[in-house]
């Protein structure tokens, strides 16, 4: 099909399709990026869902559950180096590497013989997985129409959300699968290898290709060292405010999102089936809300939509971990996880819309590292707070106090909705 042929997005329900006309090239790129987000959402949520089973199989103490995830999150530092190199060698080449690396080490996780091997395999999985996520949002920012970037960011987050839903469905059989939790990682690796094969047809983004022609004669080594200096010199305030917002969001939401499944099983005493009866319907609602919120941000603006979504998630998480055990848990989970995933998607896209093309992969990596690093610190503190309170709920509620910092920071960012990327970068 010709790249300039009209896009149809028939693989999406009518109400979730883009609000403006797009071409086949844009649909193809979005599909190849979005499918990877779908299966990455599955992969990254297995540990949180199957925590009790993995904990029992690898003999992990209760106060080390959250700190273990904080160890995983140090992978973001290596991921930053990989993602930043996309500003030098291109988005396409790196995306081919990251999806294959994530698939390979997801499969390796299933064969972990002990705790150290499990941590090592998951560290490598997340190095490539985090790099993948950083680059996906860069591609979306550079290829989608200005009036559809909010929709694209929201839909990408929704696909990640849908992947988490598939993980919940697979988790339903964790006690009957031949290899238990290990089978969940095997299941997740197969489609990632398939996406890696299909991604051979992913084209380079037009904006990077144009930038590359201008910069082709410059030393790549010199470019690497100067990139961050130029970024800090040209956009210091934007960069600082964006990183404060990312840190506040990551610090507040990381323990809440990760410990939800364990909390339901260990504190509320839900079975895997009951956990799925909360997660799956809530996930479907959250999926629709995430796409709607992305489209809403194109009309009302990124700032007001992001503030509303993040505030909704923070309040819902605080109530979810309050100790109530009733039908309220389902709606609260839906709103909380919607706020977490949609908020992350909107903030990710926000960061890339306010800087020039040559810095986008670097800024995406910086935001991701700050978000993941703040979350890692929060998860470490959660382990200490658990020792003090002897309960995850109160620890999580205390750590949610950073959400207002994120909201205040977003107020001071420029509004990118409906504007061309070149206009915002000026």
Give the positions of each predicted feature.
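C-terminal transmembrane helical hairpin of 12-TM major facilitator-type secondary transporters
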Residues: 297, 301-350
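Central cavity-lining transmembrane alpha-helices of secondary-active solute carriers
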Residues: 70-84, 280-292
């Amino acid at each position: 099909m010709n790249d300039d042929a009209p896009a149809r997005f028939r693989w999406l329900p009518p109400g979730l399709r883009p609000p403006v006309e797009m071409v086949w090239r844009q649909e193809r790129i979005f599909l190849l990026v979005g499918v990877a987000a779908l299966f990455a959402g599955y992969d990254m949520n297995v540990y949180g869902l199957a925590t009790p089973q993995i904990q029992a199989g690898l003999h992990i103490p209760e106060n080390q559950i959250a700190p273990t995830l904080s160890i995983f999150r140090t992978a973001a530092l290596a991921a930053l180096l990989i993602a930043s190199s996309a500003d030098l060698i291109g988005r396409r080449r790196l995306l081919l590497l990251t999806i294959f690396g994530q698939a390979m080490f997801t499969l390796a996780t299933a064969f972990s013989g002990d705790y150290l091997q499990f941590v090592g395999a998951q560290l490598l999985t997340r190095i490539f997985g985090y790099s993948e996520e950083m680059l996906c949002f860069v591609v979306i920012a550079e290829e989608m129409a200005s009036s559809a970037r909010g929709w694209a960011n929201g839909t990408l987050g929704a696909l990640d959300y849908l992947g988490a839903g598939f993980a919940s469905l697979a988790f339903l059989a964790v006690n009957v699968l031949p290899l238990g939790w290990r089978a969940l990682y095997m299941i997740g690796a197969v489609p990632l290898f398939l996406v890696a094969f299909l991604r051979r047809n992913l084209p380079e983004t037009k904006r990077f290709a144009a930038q590359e022609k201008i910069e082709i004669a410059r030393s790549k080594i010199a470019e690497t060292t100067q990139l961050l200096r130029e970024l800090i010199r040209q956009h210091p305030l934007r960069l600082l405010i964006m990183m404060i917002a990312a840190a506040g969001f990551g610090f507040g939401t990381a323990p809440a999102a990760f410990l939800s499944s364990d909390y339901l099983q260990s504190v509320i005493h839900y079975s895997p089936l009951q956990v799925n009866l909360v997660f799956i319907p809530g996930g479907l609602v959250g999926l629709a809300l995430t796409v709607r919120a992305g489209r809403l941000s194109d009309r009302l603006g990124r700032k007001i939509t992001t503030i509303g979504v993040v505030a909704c998630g923070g309040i819902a998480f605080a109530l979810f971990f309050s100790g109530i055990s009733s039908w309220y848990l389902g709606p609260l989970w839906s709103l909380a996880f919607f706020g977490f995933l949609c908020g992350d998607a909107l903030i990710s896209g926000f960061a890339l819309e306010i800087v020039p093309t040559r810095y986008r992969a670097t800024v995406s990596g910086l935001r991701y590292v700050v978000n993941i690093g703040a979350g890692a610190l929060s998860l470490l503190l959660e382990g200490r707070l658990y020792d003090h309170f002897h309960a995850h709920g109160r620890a999580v509620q205390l750590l949610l106090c950073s959400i207002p910092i994120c909201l205040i920071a977003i107020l001071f960012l420029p509004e990118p909705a409906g504007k061309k990327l070149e206009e915002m970068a000026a």
